[in-house]
Swiss-Prot record:
It comes from Sphingobium sp. (strain NBRC 103272 / SYK-6). InterPro entries: LigA_sf (IPR036622), PCA_LigA (IPR014159), Xdiol_dOase_LigA (IPR011986). This is Protocatechuate 4,5-dioxygenase alpha chain. The keyword Iron applies. The keyword Isomerase does not apply.
Length: 139
């Protein structure tokens, strides 16, 4: 006879990731929340859409039924806020590419570093986990 496995509450399990400082797991809930934001970002794959966006960012964003918070995040180029609004970094890469920025630049901005500081941190082996493993535990 096989042993019956205990069911876990997937929502409680995913909530545990919120305890890791700076970690935003792209869940189904985030995907639903950010659907329009991610569709906007994907629209930037077409040159004509990039040109329309650059000509009048606010008006172009109004076509995508974004939440006010998502629109403000895009206009401010606040990638952490965009991720909080359900943005997927791989979709958002279309935005920083439209701005002529690298993935390294965007990742640096999300960690509070310049592109150069971020690059050096990665060359040096990445960020130390000390102090960034648990908000509740303080370690």
């Amino acid at each position: 006879m096989t042993e019956k496995k205990e069911r876990i509450d997937v929502h409680a399990y995913l909530a545990e990731f919120d305890d890791i400082p700076g970690t935003r797991v792209f869940t189904a809930q985030r995907a639903r929340k950010g659907y329009n934001l991610n569709q906007f970002a994907m629209s930037l794959m077409k040159a004509e859409n990039r040109e329309r966006f650059k000509a009048d960012e606010s008006a172009y964003l109004d076509e995508w039924n974004l939440t006010p918070a998502a629109k403000a995040a895009v206009l401010a180029r606040d990638y952490n806020a965009m991720i909080d609004e359900g943005g997927n970094v791989y979709f958002l890469s279309k935005l920083f590419s439209t701005d002529g920025k690298s993935f390294q630049f965007a990742a640096g901005s999300m960690t509070g570093m310049t592109q150069e500081e971020y690059a050096q941190m990665m060359i040096d082996g990445g960020r130390s986990p000390a102090g960034v493993r648990s908000i509740k535990g303080g370690y």
